[in-house]
Amino acid sequence: MSVRKMVAIDGNEACASVAYRVSEVAVIYPITPSSTMGELSDEWSAKGLTNIWGAVPQVVEMQSEGGAAGACHGAIQTGSLGTTFTASQGLLLMIPNMYKIAGELTPFCMHVTARTLATHALSIFGDQSDVMACRQTGFAILASASVQEAHDLASVAHGASLESRIPFLHFFDGFRTSHEVNKIELMTDDDLHAMIDDDLVAAHRARALTPDTPVTRGTAQNPDTFFQAQEARNPFYDACPAIVQSYMDRLAALTGRRYGLFDYVGHPQAERVVVIMGSGAETVAETVDWLVARGEKIGVVKVRLFRPFSVDAFVAALPVSVRAIAVLDRCKESGAIGEPLYLDVVGALARAKALGLRAGIVDPAVIGGRYGLSSKEFTPAMVKAIFDELAKANPKQAFTVGIEDDVTHLSLSVDRSFRIESADIKRSVFFGLGADGTVGANKNSIKIISDSPTIHGQGYFVYDSKKSGAITISHLRFGPRPIRAPYLIDEADFIACHHFSFLDKVDVLETAAVGATLLLNSPHDKDTVWDALPRPVQQTIIDRDLKLFVIDANKVAQETGMGQRINTIMQTCFFALSGVMPRDEAIEEIKKAISKTYARKSQKVIDANFAAVDQTLSRLQSVTIPGVLTGHALPPLVSAGAPDFVRNVTAVMLAGKGDSLPVSAMPVDGTWPTETARWEKRDIAQQVCSWDADLCIQCNKCVMVCPHAALRVKAVPAEAAAALPASMNSTPYKGKDDLKGSAYVLALSPEDCTGCGICVEACPGKDKATGARSLTMHAREDVVSACKENWEIFLDLPDVARTSLRPTVKNSQFMTPLFEFSGACQGCGETPYLKLLTQMWGDRLMIANATGCSSIYGGNLPTSPYAKDANGRGPAWSNSLFEDNAEFGLGFRLALDQHRSEAKRLLGALAPQLSGVLVDGLVANAANNDEAAIAAQRERVVSLRAELGGLTGWQARALEGLADYLVEKVVWIVGGDGWAYDIGYGGLDHVISSGRNVNILVMDTEVYSNTGGQQSKSTPIGASAKFSVAGKALPKKDLGQIAMANGHVYVASIAFGASDNQTLRALSEAVSYEGPSLIIAYSHCIAHGYDLTCGLSQQKLAIETGYWPLYRFDPRKMGVGPALSLDGVQPSRPIGDYMANEGRFRIIRDADPERYAMLLEAAEENVRSRWALLRQLAGVADEQEGARAAQ
């Protein structure tokens, strides 16, 4: 028997470790927060790791979760042992197959990271809404409450499914368990083999669908038999709970860890009991233990097997003394008398009474409550509030806990000061920025510390849906025994703030305990930092007697080649200051972790990290705390000029205090105001650009490529420029068009800039003698004050009239962007396209946005980057689902066309009472897209409303409501390649086949960027991505040529960094085309594995190597010449030049040179064949054929 290991891993890895080893086929699709399980399975399969039978499982990615369920269904029908991993909307797509699998009594186990379902809004965070939507599918539902349980009960689920023939849905709470890192004991292959009966595997094989012993399954049945067939499965469900318990007992015999279908924890004569499942059960159990030790007669029943629900087992778990029960559900079922678990408990008690199982026992009162929706915190203080409510003579029959419900008044009051954590647990909190490495370093820290046989660790990481550039908060606990505290730290003895600007924005010291240590990454040294701190921070440091240490981690990172990643430096400081383990030992372990973590990068990366570690401690400084307050007052989070909603709601969320907002503050239907990102001022850039007007050639390319619209330009009247302060540069406008005589003004919003440097990369204006550019990067501190003042002045300068501008790249940047300051990554390759759409058509723009990166940086609270013009018009934006975005956008078009048609009909009906010239003009220009014509049409609508005001009758009122639809609206359906190439492709294909006038923009990053970089069918040959770590062996799907085959679809392939003129031309032609348009836009991404400052040059290289052809296919040209125009240069460089720059290709080159050479050759052939076909379609003669013909 092999020896079991103690390891620090998260819930996803704990579960996947079992699922992979007891399966033969894993069919996967990425969705947060379950994706890691699929990623690990793919990685293990690529490495040749075997299951318990010595075979390497197949891991196959599908185009959607529905596809994954279908493939699993097929695999298990033919006798394989299958599994899949999913959550939320993905689980909903699997439900039809789940009914089939259960109805066919096919053993199967799926693992779910329980997550919120999208209702009024999407949420990636955890509750049990998705699992509860599956409770009538016929799947057994087994709940795990911790990382160890996610590991153990996965084996129970797989084993019990084989014996019971009931398929299992094994779940644990998304993020709270899936992403919590904890120290657990791993089951060995021998343990797992003892949990899986080979005879049952053979029986499953014997039932396989095969022509050797043919049967028919999946028949269509009629009323004479269907009902009876449904009831025929009853004995299997009746037997299932006992089978599950037998496997739990088998696990206990192997490992010593004992589980029950319902486990009771608490006083043996408890009078008040909570019933709960999932991670919250750990919080309740910990609180119960603490309160029972202090004399309370309380307890908790942990629900493990939710389906089939065993009345006998549940009643046996309840103390006979119980007088009041609170059932907690982590979901909301609107309109129901109660939530699912509550209803089951009430029903179980009624059934038990009818069966005499509780004869002579007083019936307890049962109340139901909701908690923890969308990962809302659930703490011991809230548990105490629930037990206090149960103690009342008339407790609330239905309640919520963790929020303030000032509308329906269901919420319980909570004493926030109630705490139960032991003093021997070390608690540390780290404030970082998404993609700065803080979270990764802290995960390594837990693993390093947990390697000690006497120390246990727990880590949990708080971040929003944005993957880069948002605040992350890491919560680490260490102690001498297993830690079961699935809630955030509220009293920390170590706090690290990795970005100095956070001190002005969030209450970093809110959880600081008396005497705690504060570590700051600071540009100020020990002698100057005190005066730079906000006054409230100084006050807290003094009041709580904090120890303060500083280090300029950014400077160390730059000097050691670490760029902007400060994680290793701050991690080293933590070990030096926290005392969790000896300093020298810690540094040695950090270096081991670095070597392991970056083994797939390069030795250069490893060496840079080593250098950073070695230089850190000499740069760490202790600060002597003065007894006086010298700091500045905290600036307001939003300015006084912000709208009421922004000041009263958005600002609270920006401060990290959104939990305090009451129910009454929330929009009831999920409708939120736009134009709120301008108040956020993230202020995260280390460097910002500075402009030398004398070197500027006024091309506006820098403004065009700015991903966050932080760099703007205006051409203003000379008299306005004359009034500008000396600190604000301007220069005479150099063009010969209508703007001649104006002053050219460039300005930057430093608090909205992310410091990506792409503007400098784009700048062609240079001093020929020195090579200096018109734009250069400077330390933020050197220029921020003047920049902020100049920005406010700039905003008040007059805008150029849109109607006076020809649609050129340069002129487009004089148009105010209505997409600004998003939460996208530094150097994002998607946002310039969206910004350009809003500059060109923003006041008439309707956007249907597929779920993905663009829906997160475009619609993730607390702010919206979409803005309004001076007239209050701007993009109307909505997100439906990942899979149906094309159809959703088509719905926009159908409604717009119907509204316009009805407006025209009403115009006709009211024409005798209206001006004939007005009516004719309105009808003739209802579909016009010309800028001047739009302005004229809007004036007509104003006149129409004036005339309608003098009319009576329903038709006049109806036309008033529809009049704006006589001005053409522009529909753009936007999303990424995961949507367009995979999950939404069927809908996209149907929409472009419909012939309707919609525009589709695919921002092609060639991976599922938002879920962490998994491969899509757009991923190119030779690239390593999650779900394809060994390098993709097949070429990228050619979406453009597929669309061109329709013949009636405008299709273009664009890359703004390589040809901004072609980009603008293609977008403009798409809008002008009266039919479906598809634009495929090259979008560089952090998932490509290089510094995105070089994104523009890499785009150009993509064109030069032929990797990304630029073209436009315009059906209007058919019959008069080739409809396809090739806009890019012919391939002039080997594609290897392009691939060598990106980490996604270099990983394969460095790890497996032989395979890389094979994939490179295949990529070169793919470029040749693709270009040959494009040249043929464009009617361009092959150069070699032309040469031979000339001979």
Curated annotation (Swiss-Prot):
The protein's enzyme class: oxidoreductase
Top-rank lineage group of the source organism: Bacteria
Gene3D superfamilies named among the record's database cross-references: 3.30.70.20, 3.40.50.920, 3.40.50.970, Pyruvate-ferredoxin oxidoreductase, PFOR, domain III (3.40.920.10), Pyruvate-flavodoxin oxidoreductase, EKR domain (4.10.780.10)
Binding site for [4Fe-4S] cluster 2: 706, 753, 756, 759
Taxonomic placement: Bacteria, Pseudomonadati, Pseudomonadota, Alphaproteobacteria, Rhodospirillales
Similarity remark: Belongs to the pyruvate:ferredoxin/flavodoxin oxidoreductase family.
Main function: Oxidoreductase required for the transfer of electrons from pyruvate to flavodoxin, which reduces nitrogenase.
GO biological process: electron transport chain; nitrogen fixation; response to oxidative stress; small molecule metabolic process
InterPro entries: 4Fe4S_Fe-S-bd, 4Fe4S_Fe_S_CS, PFOR_II, Pyruvate:ferred/Flavod_OxRd, Pyrv-flavodox_OxR_EKR_sf, Pyrv-flavodox_OxRtase_EKR, Pyrv/ketoisovalerate_OxRed_cat, Pyrv_Fd/Flavodoxin_OxRdtase_N
NCBIfam families: pyruv_ox_red
Domain (4Fe-4S ferredoxin-type) ranges: 687-716, 744-773
Name the record gives this protein: Pyruvate-flavodoxin oxidoreductase
Any one Gene Ontology molecular-function term assigned to this protein's record: thiamine pyrophosphate binding
Catalytic reaction annotation: oxidized [flavodoxin] + pyruvate + CoA + 2 H(+) = reduced [flavodoxin] + acetyl-CoA + CO2
Alphabetic keyword roster: 4Fe-4S, Electron transport, Iron, Iron-sulfur, Metal-binding, Nitrogen fixation, Oxidoreductase, Repeat, Transport
Residues involved in [4Fe-4S] cluster 3 binding: 825, 828, 853, 1085
Chain sites annotated for binding [4Fe-4S] cluster 1: 696, 699, 702, 763
Pfam family membership, one: PFOR_II
Cofactor note text: Binds 3 [4Fe-4S] clusters per subunit.
Cofactor(s) in the UniProt record: [4Fe-4S] cluster
Enzyme nomenclature, EC number: 1.2.7.-
